[in-house]
A protein has these predicted regions:
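A conserved amphipathic helix/loop scaffold
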Residues: 1-168
Length: 168
């Protein structure tokens, strides 16, 4: 997998766990930015395309023939997909597959692990959030990194467990 594109968290070549079968998308090289491509020998196959159209942006995500094959993508590719497709929501996950996020409109969201093992993810929150509060435990998380444009929080997750967070 090759990741490129201005603003992406990652840049370079990465390797997935297994081969993935997906349809080939035909697109005009001049009209689209290829943000993620699968590579095989000298061939590139677009997985995430970005087109600027009028006053907006259109993203095209190539879906594997078997939806579960998304889990075979490298962490870097999954994170880049989450980054671009969730940017308007204000929060996205950097981390492994099988972790979901459920957004609510009151500055609250749920992060759930569907894994069989412990994991640690990073939550990228737009703006300068000062802390996250774990609603169930009352624990306050402070950011690992805080910039004007985003704050990054490290969140440990237990297997098949969820956490509810409130932005402060």
């Amino acid at each position: 997998y090759m990741i490129s594109g201005m603003g992406s968290v990652f840049f370079g070549d990465y390797y997935g766990r297994n081969d993935v079968l997906f349809p080939v998308v035909s697109y005009s090289n001049n009209g689209a930015d290829c943000l993620i491509a699968a590579r095989k020998d000298d061939n590139n196959f677009a997985l995430l395309l970005r087109n600027h159209y009028a006053n907006g942006t259109v993203y095209t995500l190539t879906i594997p023939d078997d939806y579960a094959d998304f889990y075979k993508y490298p962490v870097e590719a999954l994170t880049t997909i989450r980054q671009y497709l969730m940017s308007s929501l204000g929060v996205y996950i950097e981390g492994v597959d099988n972790v979901g996020i459920f957004m609510y409109d009151n500055e609250t969201f749920i992060v759930e692990s569907f894994l069989d093992n412990d994991t640690i993810i990073k939550l990228h929150v737009a703006g300068g959030a000062k802390k996250l509060i774990d609603v169930r435990s009352g624990q306050e998380l402070t950011p690992l990194l805080r910039k004007e444009s985003e704050s990054i929080f490290e969140v440990p997750l237990k297997p098949v467990f969820y956490k509810v967070f409130k932005l402060v």
